[in-house]
Swiss-Prot record:
Protein name: 2,3-bisphosphoglycerate-independent phosphoglycerate mutase
Sequence positions that bind substrate: H125, R155, D156, R187, R193, R263, A264, D265, R266, K336
Keyword Oxidoreductase: no
Record note on quaternary structure: Monomer.
Source superkingdom: Bacteria
Record's cofactor remark: Binds 2 manganese ions per subunit.
Single GO term (MF): phosphoglycerate mutase activity
Residues annotated for Mn(2+) 1 binding in this entry: D403, H407, H463
Residues that bind Mn(2+) 2: D14, S64, D444, H445
A cellular component annotation (GO) from this entry: cytosol
Cofactor needs: Mn(2+)
């Protein structure tokens, strides 16, 4: 006999922070009658999703990967940014075996050391201080041909802010006496995660062959030309930078290629294009045999040396539910599917026993301000059906809209995105009420609550460090103040009457009144 479940749903509203300032605050200006009603009727508060509370440096804005790892693991997880920065400060980085082996092999073969990654101080996917440390280490170990392939940000940083970084690295290479910036391209192309291989192929051709839409003798000149074409950092077309003899850099057999992004989701596709023998995303004109190293683990099926392998997280929420014989569902759109699965499970790719997954394709549009509702209606259709099926104890769902549309910098579209999500929440809450279920509504980090940079006047496309909402739609309860994302998993187990494993250092935030 099938037991009917009374589920607890965790709705993660991606990029949905709380901000007192209402100026260009898309969440404040959106018409959200459902959330307004829930906040009036049910216990609610604010929790932290940034900085030290999620294992990032003090004051560092949160991000989706970090947020979901903390949400799912029930503990503060020391993030890769902090871990690698500490290794650099302690002079351990320059002795890292995977990095040293790749550089030494290239030097011995008379080859080049190619370093690629998001050249940004954003700290979300990478940090330019890590890239600088890698450049210094390569030269210190005898590399005379060091080529930096810079992916430009403008998403976790202001839209036109790359000039300072490029100038700094030009100066760095002059100081080191070796190396140069070999190419620049926007992250829109190099860091796609939605199988838009036509974008990734442009980055691949740029790095392997120096084949580009544009060619310049200086990276800053290339950037200024992109701005003249009305391309912000994120969207800069492939631009090869020539040396003093007018030659472009190319990737050749025996070279080292080191990928300096520490966040996995937007690093996977381009990595597979370099290392998978059976790769079929696009036609590769050349496939040089290189020593490829990833800074962190991007996926279990990516077979390359890893400078900083993942630390094993035991007894995450998913694992505890499996071990207690509970059922669970993970559901989101393409853009955040990895977050409710891989990241929520502490970096584990395979589903746990009793864990089902539903993937809804994100719309195929150039940027999500063109369709701010994204695929939220279809996502909610599937979610409501899953709730009504009464076969899951716990449901984890991510609505990407606030973050993905917030990143475009389009205020009006972000308002529409928030309104679309609010309508969907209404349907989910109604479905849960019919089966006696309960719901926690929260976010992984802020974004849509700040759509303009108060200092520069530019569009604000990055995440924020604001607190995020925490609403319990269920029994009469109180909510503790001062919570953080790592308190959410223990809270769910507490509501289910389950014991909380010792590995979870977070504390239950919700206390049901007797």
């Amino acid at each position: 006999m099938t037991t009917t479940k009374r589920p607890i749903a965790l709705l993660i509203l991606d990029g949905w922070g709380y901000r007192e300032n209402t100026h260009m605050n898309a969440i404040y200006h959106a018409n959200t009658p459902v959330l307004d009603r829930l906040n009036a009727q049910y216990a609610h508060g604010l929790i932290s999703g940034s900085g030290l509370d999620v294992g990032l440096p003090d004051g560092q804005m949160g991000n989706s990967e970090v947020g979901h790892i903390n949400l799912g693991s029930g503990r503060i997880v020391y993030q890769e940014l902090t871990r690698i920065s500490k290794a650099i400060a302690d002079h351990e980085f320059e002795q890292n075996p995977a990095l040293c082996d790749a550089v030494d092999a290239a030097v011995k073969a008379g080859g080049a050391v190619h370093i690629m990654g998001l050249l940004s101080p954003g700290g979300v996917h990478s940090h330019e201080e890590h890239i600088e440390a890698m450049c210094r280490m390569a030269v210190a170990r005898g590399a005379t041909k060091v080529y930096l392939h810079a992916f430009l940000d403008g998403r976790d940083t202001p839209p036109r802010s790359a000039k300072g970084s490029l100038s700094h690295f030009d100066d760095l290479f002059t100081t080191l006496g070796h190396g140069r910036i070999a190419s620049i391209i926007g992250r829109y192309f190099a860091m796609d995660r939605d199988n838009r291989w036509d974008r990734v192929s442009q980055a691949y051709e740029l790095i392997t062959q120096g084949k580009a839409k544009f060619q310049y003798d200086n990276a800053v000149t290339a950037l200024e030309a992109a701005y003249e074409r009305n391309e912000n950092d994120e969207f800069v077309s492939s631009s090869a930078i020539t040396d003093s003899e007018g030659k472009v850099a190319s990737l050749n057999d025996g070279d080292a290629l080191i990928f300096m992004n520490f966040r996995a989701d937007r690093a996977r596709q381009i990595t597979r294009s370099f290392i998978n023998a059976d790769f079929d995303g696009f036609e590769r004109a050349v496939t040089p045999k290189v020593n490829f190293v990833t800074l962190t683990e991007y996926a279990a099926d990516i077979k390359a040396p890893i400078a900083y392998p993942s630390e094993n997280l035991v007894n995450t929420l998913g694992e505890v539910l499996q071990n207690r014989g509970r059922t669970q569902l993970r559901i989101s759109e393409t853009e955040k599917y990895a977050h409710v699965t891989f990241f929520f499970n502490g970096g584990k790719e395979e589903p746990f026993n009793g864990e089902d997954r539903i993937l809804i394709n994100s719309p195929k549009v150039a940027t999500y301000d063109l369709q701010p509702e994204m695929s939220s209606t279809e996502l909610t259709d599937k979610l409501v059906a899953a709730i009504e099926s009464a076969q899951y104890d716990v449901i984890i769902c991510n609505y990407p809209n606030g973050d993905m549309v917030g990143h475009t910098g389009n205020f009006d579209a972000a308002v529409k995105a928030c309104e679309a999500v609010d309508a969907c929440i209404g349907r989910v809450v109604d479905a849960l009420a019919k089966v006696g279920g309960e719901c926690i509504i929260t976010a992984d980090h802020g974004n849509a609550e700040q759509m303009t940079d108060e200092t520069t006047g530019q569009a604000h496309t990055a995440h924020t460090s604001e607190l995020v909402p925490f609403v319990f739609v269920g029994r009469d309860a109180t909510i503790d103040e001062g919570g953080k994302l790592s308190d959410v998993a223990p809270t769910i187990l507490h509501l289910m009457g389950e014991t909380i494993p010792a590995e979870m250092t977070g504390k239950p935030l919700i206390h049901v009144k007797e």
